[in-house]
């Protein structure tokens, strides 16, 4: 096949490149203004992206780094299943962690973009639904197979030629606790992806479809060149790091103890490439702390890009990661095999991996990394019937801890760190939407690890259920038995802790899951 070389002047390239990223940003704005659930419209637990026709990511919005590695797999799943059977006006949906997803609550809406019957690429919006079924409100439960984690959607055609498959929509909504809210969130995802495809059509009419497709390839190639050039300026070396997760949420003995398990990583830098190897990591576990490889990859990419490109000069897309090779045998906790449960691992393992990559890099480029951050998404879900209106509710919150100490300054208090980029749900919105009252939300003093530069302090938050409120809760946390580590002689940060006080006044410590 004869290679076609497209010549582009630098000014036009910058305009088109930035247009792709602005399209992803506009998707974010549309979703935030139209979503129903506080988790989406206030906390921002979603990611938006523009993809070329094979499913490679051309541009990601300023969203969640946790999705860097797995969103391209989500779009590639659509390409693999439907091939050329993709038409203007179609929309696809899926959430299968073993088919390009991350965990079941993260629902992918994928819409192809056409101009004059030519496929330009895809837009994808991954949004965390506060509930996707299962026995536990919020879909976070200590189960031993993925079948217990909620409704699992393989790649499906939700809209065909502009016509909604209402039977599929009814099936989805029948399996969640808050169907009206989920219907509104799904509509917001559809609106955002539609806006993005319309923007791509405008670009195609301006520059021509063939040239626009060529620009997509050039943007990814540009990121690859930038990443490799940055790597060439850094020292070669090999570093290893080992850490232990608190457990998988499944009791391992009669006393209810939850055994730790090990993750081991080595990072080797050779010229303009990196090899990340998880040899020595424990096998997949019984509970939902098993990560699909794409989730692990997200943690790797986040940790590496933060260290190597701290000023974000390299546009994040699939081109960035061509210089990075990830090795992880199937069946490890970082490359789980079906039907292992995965819901906790999406954020807890990727948090862990991102911090551990920094720990490994500290062996040969210590001035590029920071110490361990809070190292967990610290999730609390509550669900039941709201006594104020008699309706089912599901609340899903992530609590912000501290940012790790940096080579030349302290960490930041109470901020999303590592693989996360979500915001606090404002207390006023939380109390309006759910039958809870937040009695305290404050910095936990002296909780950051001590050192020449201290780690950021964590947060203390106190919830009280309103009188008459029916609530079933679930926790998903790490760093209770394995506190955030320091680097280069820095001390560990404070361990996480959760207590429950019942109406009779008795207070007890809760496990991490």
Describe the residue ranges of each PLM region.
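Glycine/proline-enriched, intrinsically flexible loops and inter-domain linkers
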Residues: 1-88, 93-513
